[in-house]
Amino acid sequence: MSAVVKSIKAREILDSRGNPTVEADVVLSDGSFGRAAVPSGASTGSHEAVELRDGDKSRYNGLGVHKAVANVNTTIASAISGFKASDQQRLDNLLIELDGTPNKAKLGANAMLATSLAVAHAAAASRHMPLYRYLNNSEEYILPVPMFNILNGGKHASNSTDFQEFMVMPVGAKSFAQALQMGTEVYHSLKKVLKGMNQNTTVGDEGGFAPSLPTNKDAVEVILKAIEKAGYRPGEDIFIALDPASSELYQDGKYTLATENKTLSSAEMVDYWCGWVEKYPIISIEDGLFEDDWDGWKLLTRKIGNKVQLVGDDFYVTNIKRLDRGIKEKASNSILIKLNQIGTLSETIAAIKMANNAGWTAVVSHRSGETEDTTIADLAVAMNAGQIKTGAPCRSERTAKYNRLLRIEEELGGKAKYPGKDAFLNLK
């Protein structure tokens, strides 16, 4: 007999930025236990599901989550009591119905996601399986190529570049463990290079360095130097990935690059990226344009979509309606997957499957406000996503995910494949 939900208890905990977030514990009728904690973003897409905050300025500057916690402990708890834990789709559909809004504004995506994931963890425990195997009981699994965010700017760091994230991807590694080693060595090499330039080596929200560099190009140049100093070849062993978070640069129909004193039109921004791709070993650009600049996205995809992964984050917000339009209009070739943008596990998996069915890649991602929860590591492996974005190899809320992937790779042995360049399905 399948185990059913016996109890659920949510609480307010802290994320890595010291802001409150929701954690939920689920106990099943057979005694199995599952726990999940929800992350939170700094630069958020306007189309994301609603993260319910209290707005009470006397607590945590209005960022408390007592309302979301209460929604789990009352409305959700009574609705899912006795519910078959292994029926994830039905459970998530029930949560969506209970909420009844298009953007999860009533219960809160944070309340719903904590519930959805905690039940999945409990159901996996009930079957004595790790979460990745419970979600996809397969003979072989693909471990993800990591995107290490080693240099931060934009909203993730003050006094730095216009663009939010400069990342390295160890595409030439033979295993996840080797990829982690390569990325970490480049990270430490970058620290030495920055110190040699008398630059600040304090770290941003995601563990990357946040130096004061005169231009955006300097960020790429300094990373290339760090790759070489670590003994690796840029464009062969290690590639560069970018997340400029361009929606943060967009105002009144133009893109403002403050460090370069430039204001660019959509077409000029596309040409800007084309120029960078010609010059540097860039394999992936996320949110290269504003989240509603559909014409710009289509132009960028036409120009460089056959040689660079173009990832929609704020553009798609893990939402299958927006993704479906993107696929039909050829507006990119990849989607960033963030569980809390949509608010349930089933909807997240549906977005990954939709992308893969279109021949697109799906990059499983953390948020800048994280916890020690490692669900995304299991999700990336379960869905054979091939890529994961979870910060620098620094700060334990980031390394928790990398360490989980090391353990999964070890557990799987010969059944684990590290895809390298094959993770980029759509590049010529």
From Swiss-Prot:
Binds a second Mg(2+) ion via substrate during catalysis. The active site is at 206 (proton donor), 338 (proton acceptor). Keywords: Cytoplasm, Glycolysis, Lyase, Magnesium, Metal-binding, Secreted. Its cofactor is Mg(2+). (2R)-2-phosphoglycerate binds at residues 164, 338, 367-368, 389. GO terms for biological process: glycolytic process. InterPro entries: Enolase, Enolase-like_C_sf, Enolase-like_N, Enolase_C, Enolase_CS, Enolase_N. Belongs to the enolase family. Mg(2+) binds at residues 243, 286, 313. The gene is eno. Transmembrane segments: none annotated. GO terms for cellular component: cell surface; extracellular region; phosphopyruvate hydratase complex. The lineage of its organism: Bacteria, Bacillati, Chloroflexota, Dehalococcoidia, Dehalococcoidales. It holds the Pfam family Enolase_N. It comes from the Bacteria. Catalyzes the reversible conversion of 2-phosphoglycerate (2-PG) into phosphoenolpyruvate (PEP). It is essential for the degradation of carbohydrates via glycolysis. Its EC number is 4.2.1.11. It comes from Dehalococcoides mccartyi (strain ATCC BAA-2100 / JCM 16839 / KCTC 5957 / BAV1). The keyword Plastid does not apply. This is Enolase. Pathway: Carbohydrate degradation; glycolysis; pyruvate from D-glyceraldehyde 3-phosphate: step 4/5. It catalyses: (2R)-2-phosphoglycerate = phosphoenolpyruvate + H2O. It is found in: Cytoplasm; Secreted; Cell surface. One of its GO terms (molecular function) is magnesium ion binding.
